[in-house]
Amino acid sequence: MKFELDTTDGRARRGRLIFDRGTVETPAFMPVGTYGTVKGMTPEEVRATGADILLGNTFHLWLRPGEEIMRKHGDLHDFMNWQRPILTDSGGFQVFSLGDIRKITEEGVHFRSPINGEKIFLDPEKSMQIQHALGSDVVMIFDECTPYPATEDEARKSMQMSLRWAKRSRDEFDRLENPNSLFGIIQGSVYEDLRDESLKGLVEIGFDGYAVGGLAVGEPKEDMHRILEHVCPQILADKPRYLMGVGKPEDLVEGVRRGIDMFDCVMPTRNARNGHLFTSEGVIKIRNARHRDDTSPLDPKCDCYTCKNYSRAYLYHLDRCNEILGARLNTIHNLRYYQMLMEGLRGAIETGTLDAFVKDFYTSQGREVPELVD
């Protein structure tokens, strides 16, 4: 992987990630394909929304279908017929989400399979091996996602163990002679000094890119912004910056303003299946009865297949009837909305008009522009 940085506007960055399988324009949003599919979508449909790269879930793909079946197909690209770049998370967040059915030790994590209750062990070495089998273009280190809230002492112990796991991840990645890219994950909860220590340790190990982890886990939005404003300027300018698991459209805008290059989130797809649709004028809840006889498109400013061909009334009808097509059309729209937002942000950075773009974004939704700390 090669990262090119073209231009900046304030802290916002316009660039690209160049892989053997294709180029990813940044800032970029990665749709989430947890089980090797963006729910309800073919790879061609996902690509048509403007997506350059997908995120796959190491934990879930390891449990089902497993490494052996993946290898029989070649890798995850072949298995799901997506021949463009794929980033896989390490499984750390999913293990963290298991709660009481997992036990974290220095060696790794013991847990019971959420599928059949089988006892399973996952550690940094195994995570690297699974992601190698998946053929991930971007591999994420195995870390512990520090829960929120956490005391400073709890966050320090978690972060320091994640650093030790980062070194083990690096060593195993190198032992496997994996030709792809490995990203480190900055932890430290809401404590700036711990974030500093984490980043310093990761840079000493050496990675191809750096993710900001442990955010969007329940902390106030102000804390997320504060940590990003503190951490991003310290990350080497020639390395991509990835904000994991984020987020709402406004979170993407605020992340870009603070220097983030990559995002992923289940929100556009999950919300689509629940009739919660993002538009240029804010959120539309298509299940609301007001849309029952509305012949207008979902968003007249959107160029997606859904908006060009169907009315709000039709989408309302499909949702009321629990038709699969409704969820699919909603997903097409939400994913295209996210990609159009990223296209707009990239264009604004290129032309030095990001402030105006951000103002228009918030004004169209009747909201004030959040402050950006100098």
UniProtKB/Swiss-Prot annotation:
Substrate binds at residues 89-93, 143, 187, 214. Its EC number is 2.4.2.29. GO terms for biological process: queuosine biosynthetic process; tRNA wobble guanine modification; tRNA-guanine transglycosylation. It catalyses: 7-aminomethyl-7-carbaguanine + guanosine(34) in tRNA = 7-aminomethyl-7-carbaguanosine(34) in tRNA + guanine. GO terms for cellular component: cytoplasm; cytosol. GO terms for molecular function: metal ion binding; tRNA-guanosine(34) queuine transglycosylase activity. The active site is at 89 (proton acceptor), 264 (nucleophile). Binds 1 zinc ion per subunit. Pfam families: TGT. Zn(2+) binds at residues 302, 304, 307, 333. Its cofactor is Zn(2+). Keywords: Glycosyltransferase, Metal-binding, Queuosine biosynthesis, Transferase, tRNA processing, Zinc. Belongs to the queuine tRNA-ribosyltransferase family. Catalyzes the base-exchange of a guanine (G) residue with the queuine precursor 7-aminomethyl-7-deazaguanine (PreQ1) at position 34 (anticodon wobble position) in tRNAs with GU(N) anticodons (tRNA-Asp, -Asn, -His and -Tyr). Catalysis occurs through a double-displacement mechanism. The nucleophile active site attacks the C1' of nucleotide 34 to detach the guanine base from the RNA, forming a covalent enzyme-RNA intermediate. The proton acceptor active site deprotonates the incoming PreQ1, allowing a nucleophilic attack on the C1' of the ribose to form the product. This is Queuine tRNA-ribosyltransferase. It comes from Shewanella oneidensis (strain ATCC 700550 / JCM 31522 / CIP 106686 / LMG 19005 / NCIMB 14063 / MR-1). The gene is tgt.
